[in-house]
Amino acid sequence: VSLTDLSNRPQNLSRGITLVIAAAFSISLQDLVIKLYSTQLTLWQIFALRGVLMLPLLYAVAWCRGVHRNVLRLALQRWVMLRSLFLASTFLAFYAALPFLNLSTVGAANYVAPIFVTLLSAYVIVEPVGPRGWFAVLIGFLGVVMLLQPGTDAFSYWAILPLIGATFYALAHITTRVKCHDVPLSAVALSLNLVMMAAGILGSLVITAFPPTDVLTQSYPYIFGKWGSLGVAEWQILFLLACLSLAIYMLLAGAYQAAPPSNVATFEYSYLIFVVIWDYLFFALLPNALSIFGMVLIVSAGLMVLRKQR
């Protein structure tokens, strides 16, 4: 089913909202699991092995949708692979920062993506932005400054990574809109999984061939360490992550098929509520007043962009 056909589908707003909130919850749960197990599994190990476990699951979905015969060919198309490369870079930046920041900070920084989409739309595909769009960019920038608090003790250079990830996410969004809007969802998901799995394998090989210094390995084992040992518990976690990834893909696809994207995307911000709860329950962390205000500004800017697109 192409995204261009979605306007002809019956619209079910309540179903779309329910599915996207379930997707946001699943994403927050996946991020929590990765953060909790970042001391036992490396980033590259998670990418590689989760990707392997997801392959049969993705093929099963493609088979159920009747696109299994052409799914690999479609997944390997040039523009689809470029989109997947952008998204894989997003996730690499996002997950690399997870052990060093609270979930709410990482999540809020990542939600700057709609603002970057506005900027890229103006200069890359020459779409009109208008005063409201530029005002949203300004509000979002102020929100980022308040969230990250540069120049204070609260600032962490790791917080720059989610912003880099948001930039790649915006590039992926633009690529989807311009070049990949008619690609079946199963092929898009398979392409992303293949690229992320390849990134995990390549990263692991590079670390093996060119071992980092002991200081780097001991300070940042999640990024520069060797693969952790895999027992039954670790395989269960990896399988859980694979299932969560598949659930997220299915829920998001269903949400955007059920209702207008501008309505659905508004409720993606429920993710921030979930990660604040996880931060408090699992790490006894709460954002300070300035960070909360920054999150509010970022969400407001994103909603302004979405409202403009309606």
Question: Predicted regions span which residues?
Answer:
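Transmembrane alpha-helices of multi-pass small-molecule transport proteins
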Residues: 40-89, 168-175, 192-208
